[in-house]
Amino acid sequence: MRIVLFCENKYAIDILNPIQEHVTKQHLPHEILWYIHKPKIDSFPYADQVKWTNSIQEVYDFQPEAIYVPGNIVPYYLPGVKIQVFHGYAAEKKDHWIIRRYFDTYFTQGPYFTSHFEALAKRYGDFEVLETGWPKQDWIKENLHKYDADREKLLRESGKETLILYAPTFSPRLTSLPYIKEELGKLAKERNALIVMKFHPLTRQEWVDEYREWAANKKDVLFIDKGENVTK
């Protein structure tokens, strides 16, 4: 089977890579092409390891039989079954249940999402639903303690007892970013903690700039800039 792993945003890479790894480890007879959207992704960490392109024309010429997409849209004119791989768990987002008619199949994270999309499938009648889990969780499970030494090094160098990760959603309606900055500072002092912050790539730039500047003046806050993998 010819498979395209379609990455419009950088976070899609870590979501889809477990699929590449599974095919490679199992020696499955599939040919994989990655699409990396150059305007939003300035570097591809697996560039020397896999087949990839920045060209939609090359994707078309590849004649994929399946396209995996951790996003809401994909060019309708590309051949192959188009599969949405969900990229989070925020079911309360207002646009989570919108059917945009781009996909033939929705791969869901768990029973709650499956039941809702199965109901939508009955209403629309032009897509299928399959509960697969979320591939990015595979990496987390397999590497659960891989970076314990890195964590201890961070705590040792910062002189802190606890590490706290703050990774808010970008959605303006749901994010805590406008309200929580000073509370994070208090939490760091009360818990003798190092606050590690990583923002979604679609976060408003003014919020990113505000928190980056704030973190630069604090010894107990570490700002992870976009492009860095927060799972390490």
Each predicted region: which residue ranges?
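Short hydrophobic beta-strand segments
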Residues: 1-7, 164-167
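A short, charged/proline- and glycine-enriched loop
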Residues: 1-2, 80, 158-162
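Active-site and donor-binding regions of nucleotide-sugar-utilizing enzymes
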Residues: 4-144, 148
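Conserved catalytic-core segment of nucleotide-activated headgroup transferases in glycan assembly
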Residues: 12-24, 137-214
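A generic structural motif
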Residues: 25-32, 190-195, 219-221
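Donor nucleotide-activated moiety binding/catalytic core segment of transferases
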Residues: 53-58, 203-232
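Extended, charge-rich low-complexity interaction segments
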Residues: 59-75, 158-168, 172, 226-230
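An acidic- and aromatic-residue-enriched active-site/binding cleft used to recognize and process polar
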Residues: 111-112, 134, 200-202, 226-228
